[in-house]
């Protein structure tokens, strides 16, 4: 087999000579020529001479995998294969995806709408074991995502799960507790050690003098999705503020961060006064920030509003495992 430039296409013949298998991907919208000699059932030689053309996509779609190659992430990090829009042929996409872990980890895929597009997320049943090696292989080249839309190429990622660290954030305690060596969800007793306990101030929306669900720190398993040493916090009306804050760990795209706030140090440890973020002192915020990894879980409890899909991008852990398995995938 040759392409339009006359270059031979790599391939191999089966042992019995009955089948020839491609050894490389064919290009889109290309013409190939096949020549050769076959032996018929009567033992006579039969010449082969013909050509064919490959599909011409209307659009070649690039997918991306997170975490990226070489990253070290926390024990609540999901694998996300990002698409600009949800493919119509989801079954074909799913068949092209494999996850290999060392050691073996139970998990499953589900289609989730993310800010800026769609993704198919692979979440483990429980938190990842520390030190797990993960290989993701998305053989998407040649896969038709939707009519006329084909995968632009294969993508892979090899990443590692780092040390096990969980932040336990009980809004009624006015503190956060950072533990390591944790092996189970929602179980501080499964952790090997307590790294630090810091006074904190949470969202004031549950207070009797300022009832407002928009100002409640959401309860549930959050995931650290961004680490910013400096960030401008801007409130939306009627909550107008514009301030530069330091040591910011984003835990939800609804605007929740763990960050320093020197203006609430007197309230930290005794009163919840924030707009929904978890406020720490400058010293404690810096210490926590430097210990954090993307993908670390932050388990918030003690508030009246639960984290949900309405709160943004990474909400995979809001689903019990039985519900996750029943999501479209």
Explain the meaning of each model-derived region.
Residues 153-265:
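Gly/Pro-biased beta-strand-loop elements
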Residues 89-90, 144-146, 185, 208, ...:
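Short beta-strands and strand-coil junctions in structured, solvent-facing domains, enriched
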Residues 35, 49, 80, 94, ...:
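Extracytoplasmic/secreted envelope proteins and their assembly/folding machinery
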Residues 56, 87, 138, 163, ...:
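Sec/Tat-exported extracytoplasmic proteins
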Residues 1-163:
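Acidic, low-complexity Ser/Thr/Gly/Pro-rich repeat segments typical of extracellular/periplasmic
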Residues 42, 129-132, 218, 252-253, ...:
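A short, structured loop/turn motif at beta-sheet edges
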Residues 75, 231-329:
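Exported/periplasmic cell-wall-interacting domains
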Residues 60, 66, 165-173, 317-329:
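Short peripheral tails and domain-boundary helices/loops at the edges of structured domains
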């Amino acid at each position: 087999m040759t392409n339009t430039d006359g270059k031979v296409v790599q391939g191999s013949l089966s042992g019995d000579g009955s089948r020839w298998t491609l050894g490389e991907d064919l290009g889109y919208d290309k013409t190939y020529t096949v020549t050769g000699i076959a032996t018929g059932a009567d033992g006579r030689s039969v010449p082969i001479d013909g050509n064919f053309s490959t599909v011409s996509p209307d659009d070649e779609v690039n997918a991306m995998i997170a975490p990226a190659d070489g990253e070290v992430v926390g024990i609540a990090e999901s694998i996300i294969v990002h698409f600009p829009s949800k493919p119509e042929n989801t079954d074909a996409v799913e068949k092209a995806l494999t996850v290999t872990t060392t050691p073996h980890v139970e998990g499953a895929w589900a289609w989730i709408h993310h800010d800026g597009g769609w993704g198919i997320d692979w979440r483990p049943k429980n938190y990842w074991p520390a030190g797990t090696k993960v290989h993701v292989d998305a053989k998407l080249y040649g896969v038709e995502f939707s009519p006329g839309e084909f995968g632009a190429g294969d993508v892979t990622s090899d990443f590692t799960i780092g040390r096990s660290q969980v932040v336990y954030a009980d809004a009624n305690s006015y503190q956060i507790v950072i533990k390591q060596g944790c092996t189970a969800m929602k179980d501080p007793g499964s952790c090997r050690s307590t790294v630090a306990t810091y006074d904190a101030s949470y969202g004031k929306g549950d207070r009797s003098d300022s009832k407002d669900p928009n100002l409640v720190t959401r309860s549930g398993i959050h995931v650290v999705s961004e680490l910013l040493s400096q960030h401008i916090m801007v409130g939306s009306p009627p909550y107008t503020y514009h301030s530069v804050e330091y040591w910011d760990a984003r835990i939800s795209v609804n605007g929740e961060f763990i960050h320093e706030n020197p203006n609430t140090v007197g309230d930290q440890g005794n009163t919840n006064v924030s707009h929904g973020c978890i406020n720490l002192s400058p010293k404690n915020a810096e210490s926590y920030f430097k210990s954090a990894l993307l993908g670390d879980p932050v388990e918030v409890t003690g508030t009246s509003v639960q984290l949900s899909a309405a709160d943004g991008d990474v909400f995979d852990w809001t689903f019990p495992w039985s519900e996750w398995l029943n999501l479209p995938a």
